[in-house]
Amino acid sequence: MSESHEQLRQRLLQSQQTVLQAVAHMDAERIRVLVNPGWTAQDLLAHLAAAELGHCAVVHRLLVGEDTAIPGFNLDTFNNAEVQARRHLGLDELVAEYNANRAATLDLLASIGDDDWDKAGPHPGGFDTTVESVFRVITIHEKRHLRELQVAH
């Protein structure tokens, strides 16, 4: 791993620990507190778990040279559908999914070669990105949502 890989790995691990700490002591009442319009703390954890898969999919497409732009794609609609699909899951199940998805992200990061780092394309969030940047976006995205999770404390 290059230093950049290791720095990103550490950022991802630290961000994961911060998310897990934010939900670790939430009881059934707190996990159902609205933290933004329409989403509870539990929904937000579901969103973070689902977003991880989406970010990995973007990286995979960039690596093989596939177009990452999806005609008619609406990020808000996608995010809401992913959260809705996980509403039946309990907190422990969501934490397990989040952890499994983060492990897959770390495995993907470890597989990135130096020639792949700068492969670029559009991100579903509406901006241009590179393989490297997608990993950075994951931690930035979580940091933003961590502020919302803190509302439930």
Predicted features and spans:
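Acidic/histidine-rich alpha-helical segments that form the ligand environment
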Residues: 11, 15, 79-118, 136
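Alpha-helical bundle segments that constitute or directly flank the non-heme di-iron/ferroxidase center
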Residues: 2-28, 50-61, 136-140
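A short secondary-structure junction motif
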Residues: 19-22, 26, 112-115, 152
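Short acidic/polar alpha-helix capping motifs at helix-coil junctions
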Residues: 6-9, 21-25, 46, 69-71, ...
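Short, contiguous alpha-helical
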Residues: 31-77, 106, 117-153
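Amphipathic, non-membrane alpha-helical segments in soluble helical-bundle scaffolds
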Residues: 2-12, 38-45, 91-95, 131-135
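Non-transmembrane alpha-helical segments in soluble domains
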Residues: 9, 20, 42-45, 56, ...
